[in-house]
Amino acid sequence: MNAIIWENNQLQLLDQTKLPRTIEYIQCTDYHTVGKAIKKLSVRGAPAIGAAAAYGLVVGAQQVDATDRKTFLEKLEAIAGELGATRPTAVNLRWALDRMMMRLSTAPEQNVEDLRKIMLEEAHAIYNEDVESNRKMGEYGQELLPEEARVLTHCNAGALATAGYGTALGVVRAAHEKGKKVHVYADETRPLLQGARLTSWEMVQEGIPVTLITDNMAGYLMSKKMVDCIVVGADRITANGDVANKIGTYGVAVLANHHNIPFYVAAPLSTIDMSLSSGEEIPIEERDPQEVTHHGGQPMAPEGVQVWNPAFDVTPNSLVKAIITERGVVLPPFAENLAKICCNKK
């Protein structure tokens, strides 16, 4: 199941808010539709929204009424700004848009139609490189898993969260393809239940054994020695190895540390933000209180109750055993080793 499809010169995004009940694609005829899809989590996961935004910029370029290069680029900068503001925490979003604009600014072509073609080629490259990166990550990461691996994961870092294959679930997939006996424990991941709705669905679709648990069962699961390792994705990793990921990840990492269970993070180099020295500098998105107070459109809490709804938390590097990338497994000290592996990233 592809979360992002470019077909017949049109972008289609799988509406993940409707999974697993309904498989429905959003037809993105303008860049505003792409921005809304990213904002409302119809497309989500750091690598996926980066690729979606790249294609969104292509859609925007189709809308731009300009005949000269200068006007064309100015209007695209404004569109990139709008798309980049939809979600502040995931660095892949801004990375993909910056890469698209850099490709345009360095292209010698003056003809607007030629520039549009260059943009589509670059968006395709971002998409295809992500799939390839995920497969490489999976290959490196599966080596960390024992032959019989019980893996706990949080949120959804699978094919749905990327251009394809997945980051954390890419590790699981690769292990499964190697013939390892993998059993996934999926945190439901409140408040939007990405683990229940998406991770469980992906695993069931592929025939990989999966057990769904509520978030507050994770500690007891670990205490019963039912978990061999934790593998999660990331929305941003800072230069020192601090990791921003879906809210609740930090708690899982603390529990893993207490129970001496390795906590691994799988993420492409595009998720690593070397401009930030630590997780304290990461902007944390706060979302609509109704995500907490309502479910399926029905209230679950008294009207008027105050709500705090950060979408992400930050796991300090001291709790991370290793970071799995497409260039290999990065071990502590992260500040030194991330700098080495990122020095040549595109």
UniProtKB/Swiss-Prot annotation:
Report the leader peptide range: none
Binding of substrate occurs at R44, G45, A46, R87, Q194, N245, K246
Q: What class of enzyme is it?
A: isomerase
Question: At which residues is there a site annotated Transition state stabilizer?
Answer: C155
Q: Name one GO molecular function term.
A: S-methyl-5-thioribose-1-phosphate isomerase activity
Q: In which pathway does it act?
A: Amino-acid biosynthesis; L-methionine biosynthesis via salvage pathway; L-methionine from S-methyl-5-thio-alpha-D-ribose 1-phosphate: step 1/6
* Enzyme Commission number: 5.3.1.23
Gene Ontology biological-process annotations: L-methionine salvage from methylthioadenosine
Q: Which cysteines are joined by disulfide bonds?
A: none
Q: Domain of life, per the record?
A: Bacteria
Active site, UniProt feature = D235
Which keywords does this chain's UniProt record carry?
A: Amino-acid biosynthesis, Isomerase, Methionine biosynthesis
Reaction catalysed by this enzyme: 5-(methylsulfanyl)-alpha-D-ribose 1-phosphate = 5-(methylsulfanyl)-D-ribulose 1-phosphate
Relate the protein's function as given in its record. Catalyzes the interconversion of methylthioribose-1-phosphate (MTR-1-P) into methylthioribulose-1-phosphate (MTRu-1-P).
Tell me its family: Belongs to the eIF-2B alpha/beta/delta subunits family. MtnA subfamily.
Q: What HAMAP family does the record point to?
A: Salvage_MtnA
Protein name, please? Answer: Methylthioribose-1-phosphate isomerase
Question: What organism is the protein native to?
Answer: Desulforamulus reducens (strain ATCC BAA-1160 / DSM 100696 / MI-1)
